[in-house]
Amino acid sequence: MEQYDVAIIGAGVCGANIARKLSQYELDVVLLEKEIDVSLGTSKANSGIVHGGFHDHISTLKARLELQGALMFDRLHEELDFPFERCGILVAALHEDEMRAIEQLYLQGVENGVIGIEMCSRERMLELEPKLNPDVVGGLYAPSGGILEPYRFVFSLVESARKNGVQVKTEFEVARAQRDGEFWQIQSKAGETVRARYVVNSAGLHADTISAAFGAEHFTIAPRKGEYYLLDRTTKAKPSRVIFPVPTEVSKGILVIPTVEGTVLIGPTASSAQDKEDFATTRDQLEHILHSARMMVPSISENDVITSFAGLRASYGNDFYIANSEKAPAFVQVAGIQSPGLTASPAIGEYVKDLLKKAGLRLVEKPSWDPYVHKVPRARDADPYTLDTLVAQDPAYGDIVCRCERVSEAEIVKAIRAGHTTLDGIKYYTRAQMGRCQGGFCTYKIIRILMRETGMSWDQITKHGGNSAILKGSL
């Protein structure tokens, strides 16, 4: 039976940051994930924003961790392999009566210590973003806000943790746990068992179920659905900064988000879901997204839409729940991590490390710890000279499999050899299947490469593991 100092349950953005942080110390750490790959829960379908630090008051844990986490992304971007850009955030007021809320956000941002935050006139808003509705009356500008690709961020964090000694076990769905002396004995639904002195519950939507399995606190995580539209990179409606409406008590509203890869996201909605596996989109909600987004950027066209999708966030109260359990020994709760969880996640890693130390975990720094990962060359980012060099080193760079996103066979092979053996895993690692045709032309090529590289037969290829087979029947 495998034995560890720390077991982290859940390989989303929080679990990945915690794993990487603990990899800096002389510890045996395992990261447990119920899905076939990491980043397939909440982390795969969110807005990809580094928030500005003005939406929540500094008295809340989420605001403090958001502010701390936001400052860490420049260093993380240098060390890891994910796209990131500090493009700034605008909050647009379309009516005079919304300016009072803008002033409150500004004062809260100043109190929180947000650098460079600015209340803006109509003229200043249109100078910062010419694509805004000309009826805008004013707003807020936070230059420190940014955008990133969330799944690539998680993949890179996990790669770094692995490189520094963390074990990663996918398809390990926790079924039960019991205390055995100084250890937790954790059994998966498939019957595999690991032992760990300390456990971190970062299971996202399922954190309540995991907490109950360990005899810790009883609470309920309510799934809250956010639906999005994705616009093609050719849209004329792409802003240069993230655009928020004035927030309501329910949510931060429908955003217009320029992505780091050149497309545009509009959304999300915020509706209650009954099922933690309900990722369906609805026509009513998508029409609401289009209407709301056009209020801020009128040039948005339905003709630019290439896909829609939904994500679920873990709703629990008005703040994060991150604490040592008062009921279960050596058990840390990391629950209720909704917006701005992505922004706060690097700081959550630091915070959980401190909680584990407080609980008795001995931390000795690892002299050999290396923060850097290899940055995979991307064909779409290469100039002709660089691409010629890449092709000379690996001819597979000359075979463009996904023409919409200019993804080469070499990149797909690297994704597979890094452990991403589903169509979704390859999509999130490389962006193949993410373009205008949504995989219409490249999926069959990717399936052939998967079969060649893994030895799987055609009927073993899945979209995201489990019962998501792509091809069925006989050929």
Descriptions of predicted regions:
Residues 277, 408-419, 441-458:
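Iron-sulfur (Fe-S) cluster-binding segments and ferredoxin-like electron-carrier domains
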